[in-house]
Amino acid sequence: MKDTVSQPAGGRGATAPRPADAASPSCGSSPSADSVSVVLAGGGTAGHVEPAMAVADALVALDPRVRITALGTLRGLETRLVPQRGYHLELITAVPMPRKPGGDLARLPSRVWRAVREARDVLDDVDADVVVGFGGYVALPAYLAARGLPLPPRRRRRIPVVIHEANARAGLANRVGAHTADRVLSAVPDSGLRRAEVVGVPVRASIAALDRAVLRAEARAHFGFPDDARVLLVFGGSQGAVSLNRAVSGAAADLAAAGVCVLHAHGPQNVLELRRRAQGDPPYVAVPYLDRMELAYAAADLVICRAGAMTVAEVSAVGLPAIYVPLPIGNGEQRLNALPVVNAGGGMVVADAALTPELVARQVAGLLTDPARLAAMTAAAARVGHRDAAGQVARAALAVATGAGARTTT
């Protein structure tokens, strides 16, 4: 088995050990007569890469013979995340969409076709049976290549495409690709993609299979919380969130007075200013990041977090009530991501500008001292969460790959 990164121009390979809890994949470069070759096109941010890796693990669990190739670019997190998960990565030219007229816009067509040619070479090299796309810079070239482009110098076979959209508002690549895709899957009903089947967002197996009640005692001991504690979990993504850090740390005294323990991942570049803990105060555990999110989720009773698609998917999948604080940029995508859970009663949305220490103290203390309301929110979050999204996407990919039958030529 070879877990490598291949650059567009034939760069050096890179290897990484595979996590112990992940299935053993088949490398994309070892074809066999009866194995299915799947190309996963999802790069750039963790929101694109993590669902792809969850689907990769689900594919291997369904069919250990499957050959998986991840498609990415040099500028994305996939150069680190994919080899860490033990999968083969092929790199193509990144084609970001220019935000304003200029030289980048004039060069866009040539960059697109270069990326399409590179993607097509990868599809041919691994004898791809299906492309599963997750949006982002790498997806559109993969979709076009799968359609049989570019045509010269020889006629190309068409490769089936399955699209997954994690966000409540579909991005450009998936909007374009959905017109000709064989299957279109989405996280929520109103993504804007025609023919979309709602499956949720694929999450890691360690999260999808998490039984918080079973793991709670171990998780709380791990972080130093009493078994009967009321625990607030706070995180703002891999880099933390300054506004969440300020609001929650500013409420530390009030939270302690209410008997609330805090597990706060503040980000590796951030420092929390916390008051000196008084004797008898509940623990306030501040860490740069959490590398065992399943333990963090199991320890918690309530979460304050951003509302990225992956965050909402994981928090709802494990049935945690949440106070979602959408990132105040873009077109409100994060707020839309949280709305299905909020509308079902599994959480609430607080605007970033409205998140103050006073609000944190009032809302958190109110929720954690109201067992009936917290239990209702927990049940609502669990009903909305999708634990088998990765399996559903994987099964769709295998069905399309094997059920498409004869490969058509365009």
UniProtKB/Swiss-Prot annotation:
Pathway: Cell wall biogenesis; peptidoglycan biosynthesis. It holds the Pfam family Glyco_transf_28. Its EC number is 2.4.1.227. It comes from the Bacteria. GO terms for cellular component: plasma membrane. It catalyses: di-trans,octa-cis-undecaprenyl diphospho-N-acetyl-alpha-D-muramoyl-L-alanyl-D-glutamyl-meso-2,6-diaminopimeloyl-D-alanyl-D-alanine + UDP-N-acetyl-alpha-D-glucosamine = di-trans,octa-cis-undecaprenyl diphospho-[N-acetyl-alpha-D-glucosaminyl-(1->4)]-N-acetyl-alpha-D-muramoyl-L-alanyl-D-glutamyl-meso-2,6-diaminopimeloyl-D-alanyl-D-alanine + UDP + H(+). It is a peripheral membrane protein. The keyword Cell wall biogenesis/degradation applies. The keyword Cell wall biogenesis/degradation applies. It is found in: Cell membrane. CDD domains: GT28_MurG. Keywords: Cell cycle, Cell division, Cell membrane, Cell shape, Cell wall biogenesis/degradation, Glycosyltransferase, Membrane, Peptidoglycan synthesis, Transferase. GO terms for molecular function: glycosyltransferase activity; UDP-N-acetyl-D-glucosamine:N-acetylmuramoyl-L-alanyl-D-glutamyl-meso-2,6-diaminopimelyl-D-alanyl-D-alanine-diphosphoundecaprenol 4-beta-N-acetylglucosaminlytransferase activity; undecaprenyldiphospho-muramoylpentapeptide beta-N-acetylglucosaminyltransferase activity. One of its GO terms (biological process) is lipid glycosylation. UDP-N-acetyl-alpha-D-glucosamine binds at T45, A46, G47, N167, R204, S238, Q334. InterPro entries: GlcNAc_MurG, Glyco_trans_28_C, GlycoTrans_28_N. Residues 1-35 are annotated as: Disordered. Residues 14-35 have a biased composition (Low complexity). Cell wall formation. Catalyzes the transfer of a GlcNAc subunit on undecaprenyl-pyrophosphoryl-MurNAc-pentapeptide (lipid intermediate I) to form undecaprenyl-pyrophosphoryl-MurNAc-(pentapeptide)GlcNAc (lipid intermediate II). Was identified as a high-confidence drug target. Belongs to the glycosyltransferase 28 family. MurG subfamily. HAMAP family: MurG. NCBIfam families: murG (TIGR01133). This is UDP-N-acetylglucosamine--N-acetylmuramyl-(pentapeptide) pyrophosphoryl-undecaprenol N-acetylglucosamine transferase. It comes from Mycobacterium tuberculosis (strain ATCC 25618 / H37Rv).
